[in-house]
């Protein structure tokens, strides 16, 4: 019999003879495990019981007693042994449950029967919070008065165990006269959020009204209205003196000026908090009066909380002591500040007092263009210019304002009148500048109709291309009038593609000797030296071979030695061994025969021998392969040698192997006796069980057990009998909440004064109290809000956070540092604290600027180079003055009369300047402000209140952010209200916010710190970093745009305070009159208004120009300079570059040539135009030039007869597309060759011929062939050539690039060669196209190839380009 040693897993069972056996790693134990258990278990034949099978059991562990009456051992029943809800009243013996038997949180109200838990049932200290689940102890489960202090474990009572307090916003504590626990209501200075946050209620803190010497509250009256956190200017409080002209725009409306009455109606209710179960009557008295219950700052455990500094208890009312308010601010500490000194406004939006900002408060350079009001910088505010007779403007290289000096043509009177200096206004014209001109030299006629003087127009005076046929008179152009040609030996004529005159170079067959043009075409045949072949006939099917300067020779075939490198490139990667082209390829063979007839070695490496027809059939199919010296057998997959299969003779399994059999498969064992490690049959196991006798279980041995005593149920599912579980059977903490019926422990089961701090469970975090929040009387954890702190068990007002540092959106303390100095009762601005960002755009007016403080450095850059500052002709307002015609500005700032534009080009109808129009708008007599000239930057933010807003002026941007609530809220009676119950009633009502509470625009209610009333101009108080202040409380700064005109004292802004470039046009005051400039007169450096004198004019758009009506330009004559008009033989647009008018020079004005039948051209040795005479081969018929010379043309028809597309001129050569050459002899065409078509490898040679497509066709299929393209040029030019070989034999019919090259070709007979081989053309049928492109001269040749099998071809192209 085969045996299996199951130590190694089987991996495959195919072909093993054991069908239906599979293995995996999850196999169940084999039967020998059962057998071994039977042999070793308890001396009997019954195996021990398991969770899935019956068996013997030992009276140990959780069992005791005897086998016929097993009992549960003491402490054997724990929480894990009890099913949820398994313990009911009938299952528990009276008095059997003690506290040690209950797991933490075990007993809930659902586990306790009504009245089942009395004081006698609860051991002292047995019930802790861990034993009672939240809400588990109901009144019906606990007898009245049954739970005393001794029955409640320390920390057992948490917020959820406390009964609802008598009302919302209450705490549990002892009052000031008794230590007994009771409900503590909140006084007016404390408040409770719905989330249970206890905080100070600032609205209930009474602070005396502020005075000029003390901190206190302020009333929103007089010029103030609104709320303390958002004070507004009262209606009518801002008059004309406070607003700049035209300052009120929609963007100037203060945010939030639209009230909440525009909110949609709806309703909001408070969220409800869950109710607790333990009331104040169940709490033990606190140790002393005026204490609370809560968690300290170091522990979350409930403890007595004493009141610290800032808090007091009156009766049951907890209040904040107002006497501990925040002290006044100093330069080193936060505190309150009084709105006096440099501050005014309100505490939430303090502003700078009028005239509080002097020059010492404004940092140097802080006043920029945006800080200066419009029309505030006059001559008195401008610093003296660097010298007399200067202006302020931008020079030609920069828009920055600078001093402009007067140049040539301008002058300044001592009264400030700028004039054109007539003596230098218009200088004499030069080749580079406009000016007056005299009718002399080349000009004559009159000023209104000047003409060219006789002989005044030479070659240099005529613009290239301006003289046409219509301009030339008959017989007027001679050789001396023609320009030099581009090279020697050239002619003037028209090319074949255009009638335009051009330089004609000499082609092949033409020469120039001196001035004589000759034809050098020889006789037929054309010799090689002249580009021909030297032959009159070429045999059909032959190839041309070069022979130097002698006539080419012909051959019927190409010798193999002429094909480079060989006829065959390679075979299977093997290249020829010699020039003969032989390739030695070793190939392997496959032979068959009997085993004994194997061929003798050596054999070629790779030869294969297969045994066939052998007398021994088992040998047939055996295969051997030779390695060159030995036959090696290819081994078959034989089952007897394969380790993957189980052998019938027996196999050893891999380690940790398991056998798994499907439900339809079986392992059948025929054994009758078994070793201890053998697998056994089911029959054997049954017989062993049936014949065996299992003894009764004892405490020391396994055995059978009877379901009696403490057990009942069935053998497969035993259970504990009813009433058998006593206290002695239950382990400590064995009863959890899951085992106790819900609702069994209630408030009536707890005795009075039995819940002390030791019985309360730890709170959820440190520094917490027990109480009811503002929306529900239910006891809950109360956290400390802002302004309260816990040190140990002492509750105090936290002075460091009672009043937080002021921010831009909230009240708070402020430190006299940064931009503030002085004292808390009289803060002032620090020196240099006012920068450009703190000054409101447009707030610095003329009264705020000191005299002589605005220099060039303080003026803003002008809008462009070469500009001035002045008033235009339509308005006295200062504006940028640009330079018009007749004026120019140097980079050094010198203003001059621009002679190039002083006298513009004349027209055909009038003398004078160009008329200006189109660029200006409006009228000079009625100037208006441009749209958008007054922006919001001229008005301080928040300067205009709601009463100043016209109907319809408020859009979406004027409504304060987040002021519109949801559509479901009904309108409350006022803003910043809640819906809730007040401190004396639980009825829902509108709750207003007092001091210390704020409502964000997003609807978030926050408790701010306790703080004194806002500061006023007469009393100390808190201040908010808003309005004119920003920064932080420890370093407040003046807010951007906080300093307006009202805050600046007169002459407070001096030169040091003005930033360079700060004074722009909008900051300059209007000039005394229109058409003025700002500059210094000829007698003083002081800036003053400059008026325009004669010769200058100012447009409404601010352009300064020369007034030509004041400049008289006389007409030019033959003896004097003056104006000229572009008529007669002159034209052009400017006087500096006159041109000859079209048609002014005609053929009649050209000189005659030296003789008849002549051309104008350049000779062979010179580019100078000269007369060209005709040679003997040229003739002239009237005005037609003839040349009876041969020329080469091409067509597209290779027929052997002369088709119509061929030219009919005598001695004409013609090349067909097949490479054939034809000559027309005057009567018909004579074919010189038969083309270059062949059925074999060819050599094509063409000399002295420029051709288009060269067609080379050979038949057959290319098999690893080479394609050699050899190109020669017999000129001295360098030809950049690109060669590519394309195959059109593709699956989709598209061209495939199968090789390319790029190479320069230069010099005479220097070749370009490209070899494609080694498979480029392997087995490619169809047409191949070789493309050669001469990139230098833009020529391209397409050579079409149909190759032959196993052969090479050679194409040689010789051409003159």
Swiss-Prot record:
<dbReference type="Pfam" id="PF19264">
    <property type="entry name" value="DUF5907"/>
</dbReference>
<dbReference type="InterPro" id="IPR045571">
    <property type="entry name" value="DUF5907"/>
</dbReference>
<comment type="similarity">
    <text>Belongs to the IIV-6 261R/396L/443R family.</text>
</comment>
<protein>
    <recommendedName>
        <fullName>Uncharacterized protein 261R</fullName>
    </recommendedName>
</protein>
């Amino acid at each position: 019999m085969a045996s299996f040693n199951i130590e190694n897993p089987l991996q495959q069972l195919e072909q093993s003879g054991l069908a239906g056996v599979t293995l995996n790693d999850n196999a169940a134990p084999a039967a020998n495990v059962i057998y071994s258990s039977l042999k070793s278990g308890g001396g009997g034949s019954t195996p021990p019981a398991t969770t899935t099978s019956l068996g013997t059991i030992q009276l140990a562990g959780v069992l005791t007693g005897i086998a016929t009456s097993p009992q549960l051992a003491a402490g054997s029943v724990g929480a894990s042994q009890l099913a949820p809800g398994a313990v009911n009243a009938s299952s528990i013996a009276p008095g059997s449950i003690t506290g040690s038997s209950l797991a933490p949180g075990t007993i809930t109200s659902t586990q306790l029967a009504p009245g089942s838990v009395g004081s006698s049932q609860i051991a002292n200290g047995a019930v802790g919070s861990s034993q009672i689940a939240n809400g588990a102890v109901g009144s019906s489960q606990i007898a009245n008065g049954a739970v005393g202090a001794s029955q409640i474990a320390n920390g057992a009572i948490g917020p959820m165990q406390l009964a609802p307090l008598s009302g919302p916003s209450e705490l549990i504590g002892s009052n000031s006269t008794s230590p007994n626990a009771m409900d503590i209501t909140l006084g007016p200075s404390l408040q409770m959020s719905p989330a249970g946050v206890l905080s100070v209620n600032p609205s209930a803190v009474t602070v005396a009204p502020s005075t000029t010497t003390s901190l206190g509250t302020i009333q929103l009256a007089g010029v103030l209205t609104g709320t303390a956190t958002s004070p507004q200017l009262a209606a009518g409080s801002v008059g004309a003196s406070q607003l700049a002209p035209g300052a009120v725009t929609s963007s100037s409306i203060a945010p939030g000026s639209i009230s909440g009455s525009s909110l949609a109606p709806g309703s909001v209710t408070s969220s409800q908090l869950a109710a607790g179960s333990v009331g104040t009557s169940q709490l033990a008295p606190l140790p002393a009066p005026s204490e609370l219950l809560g968690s300290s700052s170091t522990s979350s455990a409930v403890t007595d909380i004493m009141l610290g500094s800032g808090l007091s208890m009156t009766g049951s009312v907890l209040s904040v002591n107002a006497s501990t308010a925040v002290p006044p601010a100093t330069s080193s500490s936060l505190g309150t500040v009084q709105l006096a000194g440099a501050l005014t406004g309100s505490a939430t939006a303090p502003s700078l007092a009028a005239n509080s900002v002097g020059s010492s408060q404004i940092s140097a350079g802080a006043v920029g263009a945006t800080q200066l009001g419009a029309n505030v910088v006059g001559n008195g505010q401008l610093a003296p210019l660097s010298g007399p007779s200067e202006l302020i403007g931008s020079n030609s290289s920069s828009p920055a304002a600078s001093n402009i000096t007067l140049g040539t043509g301008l002058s300044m009177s001592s009264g400030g009148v700028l004039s054109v200096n007539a003596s230098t206004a218009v200088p004499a014209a030069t080749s580079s500048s406009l000016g007056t001109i005299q009718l002399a030299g080349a000009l004559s006629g009159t000023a209104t109709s000047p003409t060219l003087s006789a002989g005044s127009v030479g070659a240099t005076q005529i613009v290239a291309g301006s003289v046409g046929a219509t301009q030339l008179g008959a017989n007027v152009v001679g050789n001396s009038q023609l320009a030099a040609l581009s090279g020697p030996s050239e002619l003037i004529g028209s090319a074949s593609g255009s009638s335009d005159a051009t330089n004609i170079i000499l082609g092949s067959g033409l020469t120039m000797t001196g001035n004589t043009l000759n034809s050098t075409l020889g006789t037929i045949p054309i010799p090689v030296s002249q580009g021909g072949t030297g032959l009159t006939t070429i045999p059909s099917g032959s190839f041309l071979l070069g022979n130097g300067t002698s006539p080419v020779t012909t051959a019927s075939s190409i010798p193999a030695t002429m094909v480079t490198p060989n006829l065959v490139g390679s075979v299977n990667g093997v290249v020829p061994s010699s020039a003969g082209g032989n390739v030695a390829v070793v190939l392997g063979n496959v032979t068959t025969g009997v085993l004994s007839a194997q061929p003798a070695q050596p054999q070629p490496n790779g030869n294969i021998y297969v045994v066939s027809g052998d007398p021994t059939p088992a040998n047939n199919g055996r295969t051997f392969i030779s390695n060159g010296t030995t036959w090696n057998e290819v081994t078959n997959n034989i089952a007897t040698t394969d380790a993957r299969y189980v052998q019938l003779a027996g196999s050893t399994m891999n380690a940790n192997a398991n056998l798994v059999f499907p439900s339809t498969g079986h392992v059948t064992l025929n054994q009758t006796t078994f070793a201890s490690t053998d697998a056994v049959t089911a029959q054997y196991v049954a017989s062993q069980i049936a014949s065996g006798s299992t003894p009764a279980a004892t405490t020391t041995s396994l055995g059978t057990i009877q379901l009696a005593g403490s057990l009942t149920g069935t053998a497969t599912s035993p259970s504990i009998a009813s009433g058998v579980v006593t206290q002695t059977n239950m382990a400590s903490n064995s009863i959890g909440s899951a085992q106790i019926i819900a609702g069994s422990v209630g408030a009536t089961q707890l005795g009075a004064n039995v819940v002390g701090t030791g019985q309360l469970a730890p709170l959820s975090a440190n520094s917490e109290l027990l109480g009811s929040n503002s929306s529900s009387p239910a006891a809950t954890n109360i956290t400390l809000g802002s302004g309260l702190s816990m040190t140990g068990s002492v509750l105090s007002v936290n002075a460091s956070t009672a009043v937080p540092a002021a921010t831009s959106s909230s009240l708070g303390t402020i430190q006299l540092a940064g931009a503030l100095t002085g004292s808390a009762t009289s803060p002032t601005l620090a020196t240099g604290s006012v920068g450009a960002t703190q000054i409101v755009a447009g707030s610095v007016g003329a009264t705020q600027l000191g005299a002589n403080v605005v220099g060039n450095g303080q003026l803003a850059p002008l809008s462009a180079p070469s500009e001035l500052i002045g008033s235009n002709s339509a308005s006295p307002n200062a504006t940028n003055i640009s330079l018009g015609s007749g004026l120019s500005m140097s980079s050094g700032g010198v203003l001059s009369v621009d002679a190039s534009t002083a006298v513009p080009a004349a027209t055909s109808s009038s003398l004078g300047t160009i008329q200006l129009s189109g660029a200006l708008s409006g009228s000079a007599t009625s100037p208006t402000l441009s749209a958008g000239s007054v922006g919001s930057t001229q008005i301080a933010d928040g300067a205009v209140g709601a009463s100043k807003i016209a109907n319809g002026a408020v859009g979406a941007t004027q409504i304060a952010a987040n002021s519109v609530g949801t559509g479901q809220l009904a309108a409350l009676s006022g803003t910043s209200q809640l819906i809730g119950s007040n401190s004396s009633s639980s009825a829902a009502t509108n709750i207003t916010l007092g001091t210390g509470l704020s409502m964000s625009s997003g609807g978030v209610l926050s408790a701010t710190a306790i703080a004194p009333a806002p500061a006023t101009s007469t009393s100390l108080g808190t201040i908010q970093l808003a309005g004119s202040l920003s920064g932080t409380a420890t370093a407040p700064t003046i807010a951007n745009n906080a300093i307006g005109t009202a805050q600046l004292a007169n002459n407070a802004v001096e030169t040091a305070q003005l930033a360079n470039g700060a004074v722009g046009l909008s900051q300059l005051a209007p000039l005394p009159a229109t058409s003025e400039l700002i500059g210094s007169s000829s007698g003083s450096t002081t800036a003053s208004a400059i008026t325009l004198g004669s010769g200058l004019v100012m447009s409404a758009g601010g352009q300064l120009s020369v007034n030509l009506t004041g400049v008289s330009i006389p007409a030019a004559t033959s003896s004097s300079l003056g104006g000229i008009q572009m008529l007669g033989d002159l034209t052009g647009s400017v006087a500096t570059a006159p041109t000859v008018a079209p048609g002014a020079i005609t053929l009649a004005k050209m000189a005659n040539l030296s003789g008849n039948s002549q051309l104008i051209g350049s000779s062979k040795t010179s580019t100078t135009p000269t007369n060209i005479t005709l040679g003997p081969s040229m003739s002239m018929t009237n005005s037609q030039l003839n040349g009876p010379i041969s020329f080469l043309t091409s067509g597209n028809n290779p027929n052997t007869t002369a088709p119509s597309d061929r030219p009919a001129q005598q001695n004409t050569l013609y090349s067909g597309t097949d490479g054939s050459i034809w000559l027309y002899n005057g009567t018909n065409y004579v074919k010189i060759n038969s083309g270059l078509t062949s059925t074999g490898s060819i050599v094509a040679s063409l000399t002295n011929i420029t051709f288009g497509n060269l067609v080379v066709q050979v038949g057959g299929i290319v098999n690893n062939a080479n394609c050699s393209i050899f190109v020669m040029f017999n000129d001295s030019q360098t030809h950049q050539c690109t060669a590519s070989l394309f195959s059109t034999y593709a699956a989709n019919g598209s061209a495939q690039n199968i090789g390319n090259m790029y190479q320069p070709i230069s010099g005479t007979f220097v070749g370009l060669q490209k070899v494609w081989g080694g498979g480029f053309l392997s087995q490619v049928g169809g047409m191949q196209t070789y493309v050669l492109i001469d990139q230098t001269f833009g020529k391209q040749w397409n050579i079409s190839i149909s190759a032959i099998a196993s052969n090479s071809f050679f194409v040689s192209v010789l051409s003159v380009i």
